[in-house]
Amino acid sequence: MNILDTRYLAERREALKQEILDSFLENFPHYEEMTESFEDIRFEEEEIESWKEDFEDELKEIEEIDDVENELGSEFEYGVTLVDVDDWEEYVEELLEDIGYIPKDFPSWIEIDWEATANNVKVDYMEVIYQGNSYLGRG
């Protein structure tokens, strides 16, 4: 099952920012005094254009994580479970068993419409996009 925790995304974003900052300071030491953090990097400077192209994927991923955070709001920093929409039905089944709504000794001959149940639970979740995949999370 493809599941993410937004705390992982926050850590990933910080690691990407640090990687970019380290490379920037290594390649452009004359900016060191005015560049204390990733946010201080002058991406608009002409002399760093070709260097910036090497980090296109990383910058895009940082932007995607920022978008996920903006969509989920303040809950992002506390850890929101994001479930790939393709795994949603399986996730709901496990969730309902784990929290006790479906007893462990539930008779196998009783059929549950998991698709309809998953759709009913989905009402409390919102969809976000990360790395080209759609995820559902409570925000």
Predicted regions, residues:
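Acidic interaction surfaces
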Residues: 1-139
